[in-house]
Amino acid sequence: MVGSIKMKKVSELWGKFLRIPLFKVKFGVVRMDNMPFILFHLSPIFIFFVPFKWELVGLAVGLYFVRMFFITGIYHRYFSHRGYEVRNRFIQFVMGLLGTTCVQQGPLWWAEHHRHHHRYSETDNDIHSPVQYGFWHSHMWWFVTMYDNPKYHRYELKDFAKYPELKWLDNYHVIGPVLLGVALFGIGGAPYLVWGLSVSTVLLWHGTWTINSLSHVFGKKRYETGDESRNNPFLAILTLGEGWHNNHHAYQGGAKAGFYWYEYDITYYLLWCFHKLGIVTKMGQPPERVLALGRANDAARRAARQLVGRRVLGKLTVEEVQLLVHAAEKGASAFRKKKVGEIKAILASLREKAPMSTMPAMA
């Protein structure tokens, strides 16, 4: 009895210690329990204390892209969106274990928060919307301060949470990074540990987070999805295809984000290979209606480019681009000489007179 009381007091003291505030950010407070995240961010400084070899840079870059696939192909397209199916639960568990090596929590945690983002995208309930909270919060501070947001609530996964092995893996997600660290140290000592785990992981974190932040700010919108998701070819390189983010928000339930042959999607190519090997058994594809709408919107954008400058075109919504082309077909002209505000006012007037039907948001 006395022992249990002491343990309870120790637990309470430990809880209070973890809640000690360290510093404030715009929408919350970073506390002591976030210290591992901060220290891990600082750990790449050890590159100055180990011998340098170019093979170490190759190791960091190689593990960045290998584990980026674990995030994009496993955590995102499988656990978050069920874009494909696998042969059995053992493969599913191994996939989850590989995903934990990315040091981004367990598969259930990751999928839960990502589904929450899609459900409330760009609203004040969206935990990492740059529209609502700005760049840095959407990029990295959201997951250390989200529990300070009174509007945040957990999104229950009723599909994958039924598997006890995945719940176990989610609770003990540190196993993956520990196994990776031990393997790296065993192969190449401290230099491999620093470059292969510390440097590579911090780069991987920020590469992953660009989709939350930059892909909702920079790029082109092919679809009207009710949010600010964009297609960004540069980010598609860094994230093995995830940069086609507006495509993804238009149709989430597939294995590919690059909808057309010219939109490189390394994640999809690798999943296709695993499909041929029999590991992946079924791959979801975007329906023809979505692809047809994308082609139509691209054609409208090309036509609109002849009417207004590139800068103006980038500030118009998908619906406004369609209205612009429609107005030009009806005889309206001289849009190129007008400013963005003037064009938007004209298009708003046209919308009131003759509303155009557009694709409903599928985000």
Q: Where are the regions that the model predicts?
A:
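Non-catalytic, topology-defining segments of multipass membrane proteins
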Residues: M1-T210, L214, G254-A363
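Active-site-proximal inter-transmembrane loops
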Residues: L157-P164, F218-W244, H248-Y251
